[in-house]
């Protein structure tokens, strides 16, 4: 999984969307055989457990119950989610992290986040087992392997929060070999990807530091919709959001096997063991259900969190300070406690 390559939204060619957003026209023609509204949702990478809630909503019929016939289209190399939204090729898209909606605003491309599946961005720093590194603060001054995209993304926060400096940067090419042969190495990773790969390949459990647990304020795994759909068909957006929330709650706290079967069918390279360990980590680290989501419901977002993220990034020059960051999201479709009753039902003894 190479979603780390997309951590900095600069790799998304949102400027192209400026030319074509006016082409969007809501498709209100139902599928004749089902009477359901057809919708296409494109993800940010190949099918995996981190997309499980969406697949569960398909497999368990939650989208159908909401009057929707949803097709999930896998992302991957060369798949530009904002551009697909812009030309109307898809109805909804997945945004990997908080940079994506803000970059869309910076490009004046007319789309926003309507839900954040993950309260915690699963970005991590990884070390070998060692006594001298027990926190992110301990890494100050040490060489760290990060991707080019990361330098203008969460590395900005590490500099601001922990005093990291650019002379610590070493290039990460998504090859584990340099890390495995150097016991002093530190590298970036994705919570459910590199740590498990290291365990399988090298036979040891690395130390994993989830940035979100050290204050990193970004959300992850957004649902993106263009403003035309939000304005013209808010009821469709709400139906998609609610069914997705239900899918995530069912996937994380119920039986995930219906979604897992679809995930492995879409992505033959995915295996049951990788999915299983990812689900455990999503739950153990509270990736989807923690913080505001515990009271407001899965998918929650708040103005305070968005402001904190934007303030750090704009102060460091990632964005102009006068960018209308409020335009990156809407709270109209979340924070209603939807799905909390299902979670209580599934987790009750």
Where are these regions (language model features)?
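Pocket-lining segment of extracytoplasmic ligand-binding domains
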Residues: 99, 131, 174-271
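Conserved C-terminal helix/tail region of periplasmic/extracytoplasmic solute-binding proteins
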Residues: 306-349
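Short linear loop/turn motifs
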Residues: 71, 79, 212-213, 276-284, ...
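Short helix-capping segments at alpha-helix termini
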Residues: 62-65, 162-164, 201-203, 269-270, ...
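Short low-complexity, flexible loop/linker segments enriched in glycine and/or proline
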Residues: 85-88, 108-110, 203-204, 223, ...
């Amino acid at each position: 999984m190479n979603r780390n390559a997309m951590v900095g939204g600069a790799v998304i060619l949102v400027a192209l969307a400026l030319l074509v957003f006016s082409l969007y026209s809501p498709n209100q023609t139902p599928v004749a055989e089902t009477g359901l509204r057809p919708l296409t949702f494109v993800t940010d990478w190949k099918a995996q457990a981190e997309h499980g809630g969406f697949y569960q909503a398909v497999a368990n019929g939650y989208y159908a119950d909401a009057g929707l016939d949803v097709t999930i289209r896998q992302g991957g190399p060369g798949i530009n989610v904002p551009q697909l939204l812009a030309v109307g090729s898809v109805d909804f898209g997945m945004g990997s992290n908080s940079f994506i909606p803000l970059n869309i605003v910076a490009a004046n491309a007319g789309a926003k986040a309507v839900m954040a599946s993950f309260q915690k961005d699963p970005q991590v720093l990884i070390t070998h087992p060692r006594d001298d590194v027990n926190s992110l603060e301990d890494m100050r001054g040490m060489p760290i392997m990060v991707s080019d995209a990361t330098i203008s993304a969460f590395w900005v926060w590490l500099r601001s929060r922990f005093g990291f400096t650019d002379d610590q940067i070493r290039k990460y090419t998504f090859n584990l070999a340099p890390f495995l042969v150097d016991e002093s190495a530190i590298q970036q990773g994705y919570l459910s990807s590199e740590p498990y790969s290291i365990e399988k390949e090298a036979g040891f459990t690395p130390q994993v530091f989830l940035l979100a647990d050290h204050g990193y304020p970004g959300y992850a795994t957004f649902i993106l919709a263009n403003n035309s759909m939000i304005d013209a068909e808010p009821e469709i957006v709400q139906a998609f959001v609610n069914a997705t929330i239900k899918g995530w709650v069912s996937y994380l706290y119920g039986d995930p096997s219906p979604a897992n079967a679809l995930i492995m069918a879409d992505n033959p390279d995915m295996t049951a063991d990788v999915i299983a360990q990812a689900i455990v980590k999503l739950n153990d680290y509270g990736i989807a259900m923690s913080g505001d989501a515990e009271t407001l419901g899965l998918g929650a977002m708040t103005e305070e969190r968005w402001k904190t993220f934007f303030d750090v990034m704009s102060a460091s020059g990632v964005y102009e300070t006068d960018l209308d960051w409020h335009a990156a999201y809407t709270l109209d479709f979340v924070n209603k406690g939807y799905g909390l009753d299902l979670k209580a039902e599934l987790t009750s003894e």
